[in-house]
Design a protein with these regions (language model features):
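Hydrophobic alpha-helical segments that drive targeting, anchoring, or assembly
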Residues: 1-88
Length: 91
């Protein structure tokens, strides 16, 4: 699962301190979005690999976890778009 290595890289790249201002907060959101995408990829690969080997409720739970991870990515994408619009209202 190379996606796990990519996820670990995204997580270790997160800043260890709070953002000092709007620009740093936006960078944090971008890195979190990347980590959320990687997490969704890990869950997708796990679901594909385990398909047919799990009881129905376990498969449903894994599917739901993947969907929630995708939703997290989308919410962070929306947050980043809002930051860009706030920074440059003409966009």
């Amino acid at each position: 699962m190379s996606e796990i290595q990519a996820l670990l890289g995204a997580l270790t790249g997160l800043p260890r301190t709070r953002p000092a201002g709007p620009a740093e907060a936006e960078v944090l959101l971008a890195r979190l979005r990347s980590a959320a995408a990687r997490w969704a990829d890990v869950l997708y690969e796990a679901h594909e690999g385990a398909y047919g080997h799990l009881p129905p409720r376990a498969e449903a739970a894994l599917t739901l976890a993947f969907r929630r991870a995708e939703e997290s990515y989308v919410e962070l994408e929306i947050a980043l778009r809002d930051c860009a619009e706030h920074r440059d209202p003409a966009r």
